[in-house]
Amino acid sequence: VEWTDAERGAILSLWGKIDPDELGPALLARXXLVYXXTQRYFASFGDL
């Protein structure tokens, strides 16, 4: 994929607004609930 400078700027701007410490746990929980089979990849996390 080749990105234009405008596309790169838009992507960097969006990623700059994301707080991984806030969203990470919520996204992992959502992935484990919607795609229950993914829990096997996170067995070390305990019962999600």
UniProtKB/Swiss-Prot annotation:
UniProt cross-references to SUPFAM superfamilies, sorted A to Z: Globin-like
Keyword Transport found: yes
GO molecular function: heme binding; metal ion binding; oxygen binding; oxygen carrier activity
Keywords of this entry: Heme, Iron, Metal-binding, Oxygen transport, Transport
Domain Globin: 2-48
Gene3D superfamilies per the UniProt record, alphabetical: Globins (1.10.490.10)
InterPro entries: Globin, Globin-like_sf, Globin/Proto
Subunit structure: Heterotetramer of two alpha chains and two beta chains.
Leftover remarks: This fish has ten hemoglobins, 8 of which are anodal and 2 cathodal. The cathodal tetramers do not exhibit the Bohr effect, due to lack of the C-terminal His in the beta chains and to blocking of the alpha-amino group on the N-terminal residue of the alpha chains. The possession of both anodal and cathodal hemoglobins may be a physiological advantage for fish living in fast-moving water habitats.
Protein family (similarity comment): Belongs to the globin family.
Reported function: Involved in oxygen transport from gills to the various peripheral tissues.
Protein name: Hemoglobin subunit beta-B
Gene: hbbb
